[in-house]
């Protein structure tokens, strides 16, 4: 399975540009045979845009997830993307994975928040997600989470 990774600038709050870049990246990756494209932690809005996360975080099933699912289906290429999720009064550093038909396979909230800034804005996640992608059991972890062996069991 070919998995592509987007390594480039974040949209820094420009959602039109963010979804334009997701669309372009999925199209290019799919043409090259990728089955999945992975975008960075908090790609939507940008990692260092903490004031925007508080202001613009969206709920599960909101417009951002709908657009991501639509683009994955359009290009027949899976997508894993980091975003700020609002659940009532809490905000999570989250990531969602969509398969090539636009179905959401997994959703994860970062458990190991890093540093005082993340901890001041985001709530701690408390569960894992696993799913099967093209016959392979897989999961989502976000950045600092990978430093803790207990997440691998």
Task: List each language-model region with its residue ranges.
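Active-site catalytic loop in hydrolytic enzyme cores
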Residues: 60, 66, 86-153
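Short, solvent-exposed loop/turn segments at secondary-structure boundaries
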Residues: 14-18, 119-120
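Short, acidic/polar
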Residues: 17-28, 146-153
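Active-site micro-motifs of SAM-dependent methyltransferase domains
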Residues: 10, 44, 148
């Amino acid at each position: 399975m070919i998995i592509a990774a987007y390594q480039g600038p974040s949209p820094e709050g420009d959602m039109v540009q963010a979804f334009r870049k997701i669309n372009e990246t999925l199209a290019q990756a799919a043409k090259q045979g990728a089955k999945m494209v992975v975008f960075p932690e908090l790609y939507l809005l940008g990692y260092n845009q903490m004031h925007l996360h508080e202001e613009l975080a969206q709920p599960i099933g909101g417009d951002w997830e709908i657009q991501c699912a639509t683009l994955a289906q359009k290009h027949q290429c899976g997508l894993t993307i980091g975003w700020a999720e609002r659940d009532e009064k809490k905000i999570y550093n989250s990531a969602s994975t969509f398969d090539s038909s636009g179905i959401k396979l997994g959703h994860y909230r970062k458990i190991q928040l890093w540093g005082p800034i993340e901890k001041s804005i985001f709530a701690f996640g408390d569960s894992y997600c696993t799913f099967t992608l093209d016959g392979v059991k897989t999961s989502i972890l976000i950045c600092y989470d990978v430093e803790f062996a207990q997440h691998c069991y």
